[in-house]
Amino acid sequence: MEKDQIFILKDRGIIYISGEDAKEFLQNIVTNDINKVSDTSSCFASLLTPQGKYLFDFIIIRHKQGYFVDCEKNQIDQLIDRLNIYKLNSKIEILNLSNEFEVAVISKEKFLALENAKDIVGNTVKYNGDPVALDPRSKNLGGRLIANLE
């Protein structure tokens, strides 16, 4: 990857989960500790069946009063359906924001040039109000920018 290039990932979609119970809801259903997710730290997680079989994987990034879920665009409807099954009486809202946000990738070097960026897996900063996270799977994968299309 050229260090100054930005690549739009057309195969990625964005779900936004917000509401009073959003943190507890995610903590109870995904494979990573949501308590570690903050304005400065993101995580990689999966959703499994009750029997422990893999269903989906995604990156969770804190944004405003909720969480962005960066997932495969072709699975977004199935993931939202599954999340709604687990929603029950939780005070949350689950929105497909794929038409309003794009996922882009920048080089690790470009990420580290951003203000307050650290060379730590999952480190998250803001750029023009949009979150940019050093990929929580491996920092060598670069930064992931969730950019508002407006």
Spell out what each predicted region is.
Residues 1-150:
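Basic, glycine/lysine-rich polyanion-binding surfaces/domains
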